[in-house]
Amino acid sequence: MGGNGHRPPGTLPPMSETPTPPTAPRSTMLVATDADHVHDEVAAALGGDHEVVRVHAGAEVLAAVTAHQPVLVVLDLQIGNMGGMAACLDLRLEQRANRIPAQRIVMLLDRDADAFLAHRAEADAWVVKPVDPLVLRRTAREALAA
């Protein structure tokens, strides 16, 4: 580089001068489970697209939704003393009362027969455990697109 501040043709600017493209903020996804392996499976499947926030009990879901405003909530059917079904119904009641914005809810079920419970809890979609990452990604994408 000469004294006039120009670069020879075809040379790259120093790293300190290279503009960094702005990164789009990642949307937040809330996972409610007390099982570490379930959290790890969900975070591995969806974490590349979303910032993953975890709560360990159904009673913590509403406060976490209020604080983080996730676009997607993943509820394990079996969590603590307030299970995924109760947490899902609680969110839907709060949404209908206009106290929180609407979120898409995916429930993680223990068996196919639990689909009845997920439907009654007004979940947008559900996946039966063990979690297949491809199925969970597709289910989450479809729930968010609905």
Predicted regions: what they are:
Residues 25-37, 41-43:
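Conserved acidic segment of CheY-like receiver
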Residues 71, 75-93:
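Conserved phosphotransfer microenvironments
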Residues 86, 107-125:
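Alpha4 helix (beta4-alpha4-beta5 surface) of REC/receiver domains from two-component response regulators
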Residues 73, 126-127:
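Two-component signal transduction core modules
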Residues 29-33, 55, 73, 108:
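Conserved sequence signature across two-component system core domains
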Residues 69-71, 96-104:
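His-Asp phosphorelay/catalytic-motif detector in bacterial-type signaling
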Residues 56-72:
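Acidic, metal-coordinating helix/loop segments flanking the phosphotransfer/catalytic sites
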Residues 131-140:
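C-terminal output helix
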